[in-house]
Every structure is written in C-alpha cells, then in structure tokens.
C-alpha cells in the first residue's frame, strides 16, 4: 500500500516509492496514478472512472512526497502554483565528493531519443534555463548530504546539474559513471 501523507476532498498527498513510475509507461509496471485511483475508488465506493489530477512528476528512480488533485478545480490551482513557482520543491540527496553548496544555473536540453538530459550552452536550440540552490547538511566518507531547492523544474535537473558541478548523486545509474549496478539513487523529494 502507498503511504498516505494527507487527504481531503481536494488533495491527496502520498509517499511515492522509489523505482515506481508516476504514470503508466511501456514497461507495464504498476504505476502510482493507477494505484491511487484504485485506492480512491475502493475507499469511497466510486462507480466508473475516478478523477485524479497529476500536477507534478518525479523521476522513476526517485521517491518522496507527491501531491495529486482530486478535483479539476484543485488541479488548476495546484498546476498554477507549480508553474508560477509558488510550490516549494525541496529534496534531500547524497552527492559524491565534498559539495560546498551554492547556486547552480545553466541550460538543460532533453534528448527525447535517449531519455537523458544534458547541460548545454545558452544558445542551444530547445535548451531551457535551470536554477537550483543546494546546501550541505553533513559530510561523511567523501560524500555530502545536501538539501536541494529547485527554482525551475527541468527534466532530471538535480541529477544533471549536480553531476555537471562535479558532485553526481550516489547510485545514479544514468549520470554517475561510478555508480554500481543495483545501487539506489540517493534522492528523495
């Protein structure tokens, strides 16, 4: 069962498990949105389809808190908060190296063919600006526990920007060439 963090008539906040897709994909694996629709349908004896608005996403390997809208009005308001940066998005991550903290700004381009993103020059066609701040919480064994605040929400942004700064996330199979198979990415929303 998916842990429920908060629930009312308008919102549903849950703890997304790591390695679960937020919505259905070609893998056919169970996805969070479908499971939560089933939860609402069963709990409230809802006939037919259940509305549940997806207003933000987390990468498949990342776990953490997610908010869903139970009404279209709530979906519009939440989407507005996310797009206007009214929603505060904070993450905990374990980065390789002794990350000093600070602000990272740059441009990210998503490669649709590979599903990866990369830091690129500002004038690159299709590139989007990306900004985050991060602060060290603790240092241990050549790694840093950091708190990351997103100011933009780009594809794989934290993973790409910290790796680009020389502090890839522990266990990140895509952007940390030293990650070992089977390691779980150390990133939590």
Listing of model-derived features with the role each one plays in the protein:
Residues 1-189:
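RNA pseudouridine synthases
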